[in-house]
Swiss-Prot record:
Protein name: Co-chaperonin GroES
Keywords: Chaperone, Cytoplasm
Organism: Nitratidesulfovibrio vulgaris (strain DSM 19637 / Miyazaki F)
InterPro entries on file: Chaperonin_GroES, Chaperonin_GroES_sf, Chaprnonin_Cpn10_CS, GroES-like_sf
Keyword Chaperone included in the entry's annotation: yes
Length: 95
């Protein structure tokens, strides 16, 4: 399925969380939190300002981003969990 976000919305695929801690301890699935970073799969054209001008998106397809824990709306595309969120919900681009 192909999904094209509108306006300032972004489609993000969550990246897998770490399997073990820095100290080498394995984290069981029941103790893992949903990861708060992901890869931008698609991005809309941007937000329309009050004066009618288009404000271009900062993020682009392929960017790895950090977002808040409760950001976006969860959807499944081809059996894979994704999030649709506004660009404002993205906290940072990881370089």
């Amino acid at each position: 399925m192909n999904l094209k976000p509108l306006n300032d919305r972004v489609l993000v695929k969550r990246l897998e969380s770490e399997e073990k801690t820095a100290g080498g301890l394995f984290i069981p699935d029941t103790a893992k939190e949903k990861p708060s970073r992901g890869e931008v799969v698609a991005a809309g054209p941007g937000k329309v300002a009050e004066d009618g001008k288009l404000i271009a998106m900062t993020v682009k397809k392929g960017d790895t981003v950090l977002f808040s824990k409760y950001a976006g709306t969860e959807i499944k595309l081809d059996g894979v969990e994704h999030l649709v969120m506004r660009e404002d919900d993205i906290l940072a681009i990881i370089e």
